[in-house]
Amino acid sequence: MNFYRSSIISQIIKYNRRLAKSIICEDDSQIITLTAFVNQCLWCHKRVSVSAILLTTDNKILVCNRRDSFLYSEIIRTRNMSRKKRLFLNYSNYLNKQERSILSSFFSLDPATIDNDRIDAIYPGGILKRGENVPECLSREIKEEVNIDNSFVFIDTRFFIHGIIEDTIINKFFEVIFFVGRISLTSDQIIDTFKSNHEIKDLIFLDPNSGNGLQYEIAKYALDTAKLKCYGHRGCYYESLKKLTEDD
């Protein structure tokens, strides 16, 4: 596990049975530790994101391409001008072309010439707003990011996966809770209704049986875990997200 003081992992371990062995997956900018638990008692801290790994009816995994790279968001967010410049000059290859152009003009600096166009991918989800529960948060985020109504989404709440994400570029840690789910739509139907927005530029669909990269590794761990027996769970097997929202 990452050397990070988690805000909720001690409570998760205390009240939820571990379902599968932890794994670590990483690339050139992130190290992610994943641990699956039987859903016996889960609540989410305000700084913990909730995300859904969703399969379409044509057996594709839905993934969102962020409009802004993680690095660009951090450079814009930080108030320390020296840190802004350092991140830009040292890691400009983790920006997309438009971001590099914008920041070059802003700082009047030219980093080393880079041709790549960075794309950061995520699963739909986000942080709970005040007064929201997990189903409400997922419903809102999936609608905002992907334009899918919660009546088309079904979530397996028998288990969840706790993730610690270390961003080695900006030197920060993040926590996320993943759920597995299904969408009663094909990938083509989802693309037809999707509208590019301020958070998500476009969508991609992964083959759950073959692939590479962090999003594929996360999905494979989640889908393999879904096949295990979740004895003692207090959730549901692919319950309608709309019904979960109404029940809570």
Curated annotation (Swiss-Prot):
The active site is at E141 (nucleophile). Induction: Expressed in the late phase of the viral replicative cycle. Its EC number is 3.1.3.-. Mg(2+) binds at E132, D167. A motif (Nudix box) lies at residues 125-147. GO terms for cellular component: host cell mitochondrion. Residues 45-227 form the Nudix hydrolase domain. It is found in: Host mitochondrion. Its cofactor is Mg(2+); Mn(2+). The keyword Ubl conjugation does not apply. Keywords: Host mitochondrion, Hydrolase, Magnesium, Manganese, Metal-binding. Its main location: host cell. Mn(2+) binds at E145. It is an enzyme of class 3 (hydrolase). GO terms for molecular function: metal ion binding; phosphatase activity. It comes from the Viruses. The keyword Transmembrane helix does not apply. Decapping enzyme that remove the protective 5'-cap from both host and viral mRNAs to commit transcripts for decay by the cellular exonuclease XRN1. Preferentially targets spliced mRNAs and since all viral genes are intronless, it preferentially targets host over viral transcripts. Acceleration of the turnover of cellular transcripts promotes the shutoff of host protein synthesis and therefore diminish the magnitude of antiviral response. Belongs to the Nudix hydrolase family. This is mRNA-decapping protein OPG122.
